Amino acid sequence: ITEEVAAAAAVGAGGYVXXLGEAGHHHLFNHE
């Protein structure tokens, strides 16, 4: 795992999942 993926996962868990939900989750995994 890279720093970038780890940071994205942390942000996703705290922000995207909450705020953007499915869209944020898919964006993070697509970036990986």
UniProtKB/Swiss-Prot annotation:
It comes from the Eukaryota. On the 2D-gel the determined pI of this unknown protein is: 6.4, its MW is: 16.9 kDa. This is Unknown protein from spot 206 of 2D-PAGE of etiolated coleoptile. It comes from Zea mays. The lineage of its organism: Eukaryota, Viridiplantae, Streptophyta, Embryophyta, Tracheophyta.
